[in-house]
Amino acid sequence: MRRLDDRWKVQSECADGTGRRSVYLTFDDGPNPCFTPQILDVLAQNRVPATFFVIGAYAAEHPELIQRMIAEGHEVGNHTMSHPDLSKCGLGEVQREVFEANQAIMLACPQASIRYIRAPYGAWSEEVFTASEIAGLAALHWSIDPRDWSRPGTDAIVDAVLASVRPGAIVLLHDGCPPDESTRSTQASLRNQTVMALSNLIPALDACGYEIRSLPEHH
């Protein structure tokens, strides 16, 4: 199976055609009952939008967080039902992961409009593209990965984004962790660096003349 051989099928930047210095914040692997509310609080305090690529099983466990995301003007995307490496899955399994995640999101919040999918680990394949197209979802990757999941330090996360930012950039951050990793981390400190980094990153991007915006309509 191919992994990003067909890069033209995966959007990793967004040129919105307005000429603005737009940047897009995305969060993977939630919702997490500890850290997602903190991240939503920071976004609300700064009045900026984000897109949350949620794991369907977590959405089913915490529908109130999906509802809060939508109520506060954010977007929810599909990050599969259980976060497998889809490049190792057959088409049937990929379709189940995508469909069940969509279903879980809509059950959690019927007002959600799901436009995008992001493959776990960024592991794209022809099967993922096919399943996404059937589900009416556009494949969305990222252009900046500060590796916040590795807990490199708050300043390191912010500096990594600022060093690579450009108009149309899609920033990858994490508000939770996959099911197979959740038992290996201390919940109390799992994503605290991401929360603190976000509080510093938003004003830093603003100072550099960037505007954090919602993802534009895909074509």
Curated annotation (Swiss-Prot):
**EC number(s) in its UniProt entry?**
3.5.1.-
Per the database record, which ranges form the NodB homology domain?
A: 21-213
Site for Raises pKa of active site His, residues: 148
Pfam families on file: Polysacc_deac_1
Q: Where are the transmembrane segments?
A: none
- State the active site: 28 (proton acceptor), 174 (proton donor)
Residues making up the signal peptide according to the UniProt record = none
MF (Gene Ontology): hydrolase activity, acting on carbon-nitrogen (but not peptide) bonds; metal ion binding
Q: What is its main location?
A: cytoplasm
UniProt subcellular location: Cytoplasm
> What CDD domains has UniProt attached to this entry?
CE4_NodB
What are the GO cellular component annotations?
cytoplasm; membrane
Q: What positions does the entry give for a divalent metal cation binding? A: 79, 83
Q: What does this protein do?
A: Is involved in generating a small heat-stable compound (Nod), an acylated oligomer of N-acetylglucosamine, that stimulates mitosis in various plant protoplasts.
Q: What is this protein called?
A: Chitooligosaccharide deacetylase
